[in-house]
Amino acid sequence: MPVLLIVVDGLSDRPIDGKTPLSVARKPNLDRLAEMGINGIMDTIAPGIRPGSDTSHLALLGYDPYKYYSGRGPIEAAGVGIEIKPGDVAFRANFATVEGEGSIFDKTVVDRRAGRIEDTSELIKALREIELPVELLVERGTGHRAAVVFRGEGLSDRVSDTDPKAVGKKVKRCVPLADDAKAKKTAEIVNEFMQKAHEVLENHPLNRERAEKGLLKANALLLRGAGEMPHVPSFKDKTGLRLCVIAATALIKGVGRVVGADVITPEGATGNKNTNLEAKVKAAINALESYDVVLLHIKATDELGHDGDFEGKKAFIEKLDEKIAPLLDLDFSKTCLILTADHSTPIKVKDHTADPVPVVIVHEDVRRDEVSSFSEFEAYKGGLCRIRGMDLLNIALDLLNIAKKFGA
Amino acid sequence: MPVLLIVVDGLSDRPIDGKTPLSVARKPNLDRLAEMGINGIMDTIAPGIRPGSDTSHLALLGYDPYKYYSGRGPIEAAGVGIEIKPGDVAFRANFATVEGEGSIFDKTVVDRRAGRIEDTSELIKALREIELPVELLVERGTGHRAAVVFRGEGLSDRVSDTDPKAVGKKVKRCVPLADDAKAKKTAEIVNEFMQKAHEVLENHPLNRERAEKGLLKANALLLRGAGEMPHVPSFKDKTGLRLCVIAATALIKGVGRVVGADVITPEGATGNKNTNLEAKVKAAINALESYDVVLLHIKATDELGHDGDFEGKKAFIEKLDEKIAPLLDLDFSKTCLILTADHSTPIKVKDHTADPVPVVIVHEDVRRDEVSSFSEFEAYKGGLCRIRGMDLLNIALDLLNIAKKFGA
């Protein structure tokens, strides 16, 4: 009796001339799900609170983001594959090009992406050899991106970025943002790492090769967004259920890993509009065999919203509609299917907003309503009225009679 | 990109023979706003919790009243113009007539309004000269009303009223309501004030004049509703936004001052049904030029509800509808207009109830719904479904893209 939770990132919108990509898209399968299920609108965090994809996914999995979210760093680090632990301090990082004399902090950023370097695997290996008073974990992300984690006693995330976030500026020294020993110690370690990383990178054969080819050297790692990994109970411990997250996006994979889920990225799943939707849908159907809760994340709608691409978002929704057709054949006497979004990414705003998302829950036992179209203009008329993200999974588990009674 | 929040006090009702003043009033402009906007119902505090106008206005401004409300005293004191500070203990007070021998506590209340005395300004001046172990602040309210504030170390609001709340009863001695030194100290100071105030008033020339004219002496000040002013972050500090409150009612002006708003009472604004609505609407339109959030409070609907005057409430709603016509010409690509109430004051109950209030949010970017009439019987069919007072401003700030993202 599994739950399939399909989260279409940034799916919903604000109207432009009364229309949204979702409302005008041809989407017979999504509409059929609306017709079969019980519909409503949902504030993934709370009304008027603009969700990140990380905070909203935590909430959708039943984790209060106000309690369990401490910034993007730890989630990105988990997303790229670092086995992050409570107390670790994680940073997002990018390989950059710096120039000038003296220490790393005397040098000027020439390019924040090191000439859009693609393969940093050799550089990452070299960085891992750096010796620090605490344990160091480094992992590459896509392109010039990376994650850096410091592990040891008495560290704190109350420290500043070393990334000046602009070219032509000097690399910033990490400073404590709190008047305590932990923050001071962490800042010192970060600065030691910054200098040692620069030395390792500057002298790395790959960078000599790049220089010879006229490419920019990836000779510094700039850090930002320190976050301390909180104590997050695993989904299994919390609910007794096996969770699988199917995603290609590091941030969502990170949320999955932080809560102890198995994370699957099917072949060809990319997190953009050319992703292999068939493979993702197939992976989801397979996962329903061996997991209690399967979260299927679809990213491109959000990107197309950030791009302000109305037609592109509409077209991708139509493609998605086509590709999810096999899900309509699931046995809804056993499976509970939920279709929703993590937040709105309106074309007009090009960023996340708090406009509530449509949600439909399909299962044989739901109280079906009169909604027969999946859109921002119909969902609120449904039998769920307006719910919150933190409540969604509880509603599904209740439907499946997995929920426990509170009281007698 | 400002928010205009129009709060029509006690606007909504319970039906009598299926009708409410709002549902039967002729109100083309209010209905037009409903048609242009997204509608819903709102529990200003929580479902089933009967709001005061003070607690509900705190909630509508985003302040949790369970955290920031400590009784009517401090808010009334702020409302009449006392610059109240955290830790101050404030009382509502009324000038009264007492008779008998001995101390103030041996005397009997003859009239709780001192013959409906109008001008107490000379008496207030004299009271301010009283010497106490702590600082004393006194300010007149309307008619026989006043506010009294004690300021100093170690005071508490856990003390009883001195107002016996009935004629023919003796003035009550203030007693501590908690077994601690602060409450004991405060009660002693209150009792010292009661006696000294009585002496000052009894011998005041104005009271000798009143006696000569056969009027009742205003020879005592009765205190009730002790409240300690809590630490309330200013609206500006909390949100970064400039708030203006347009109101004539002391309680609402007090809420405004407590949160650090600029408070405007336009010429002719009275807080009753003869108030100058044109002036209030004009002041609101002007305020939108220089503030981020403008709260326009309209009081008379509540009074007419307390009076159980169905026809009077209906007639005032029709007048209000006419006078707000200029607001329909606001530029809703910039301004977000919210029309709602702080609570219901049903004709049949003659007091506040928790029946949810209708709310409409008008802005170019809202997801318009099919509601085209502003009433208790239509609002719930709208796209907002059912929200809470604390969420309202967040929803508006999200619409105006002022909201910050929580997460990544």
From Swiss-Prot, chains A, B:
It catalyses: (2R)-2-phosphoglycerate = (2R)-3-phosphoglycerate. Gene3D superfamilies: Alkaline Phosphatase, subunit A. The lineage of its organism: Archaea, Methanobacteriati, Methanobacteriota, Archaeoglobi, Archaeoglobales. Keywords: Glycolysis, Isomerase. InterPro entries: Alkaline_phosphatase_core_sf, ApgAM_prokaryotes, Metalloenzyme, Pglycerate_mutase_ApgM. PANTHER family: COFACTOR-INDEPENDENT PHOSPHOGLYCERATE MUTASE, METALLOENZYME DOMAIN-CONTAINING PROTEIN. Catalyzes the interconversion of 2-phosphoglycerate and 3-phosphoglycerate. It comes from the Archaea. Pathway: Carbohydrate degradation; glycolysis; pyruvate from D-glyceraldehyde 3-phosphate: step 3/5. One of its GO terms (biological process) is glycolytic process. It comes from Archaeoglobus fulgidus (strain ATCC 49558 / DSM 4304 / JCM 9628 / NBRC 100126 / VC-16). SUPFAM superfamilies: Alkaline phosphatase-like (SSF53649). Monomer. CDD domains: iPGM_like (cd16011). The keyword rRNA-binding does not apply. Optimum pH is 7.1. Optimum temperature is 60 degrees Celsius. Does not lose activity after 120 minutes at 60 degrees Celsius at pH7 with 50 uM of manganese chloride and 5 mM of magnesium chloride. One of its GO terms (molecular function) is metal ion binding. Its EC number is 5.4.2.12. This is 2,3-bisphosphoglycerate-independent phosphoglycerate mutase 1. The keyword Isomerase applies.
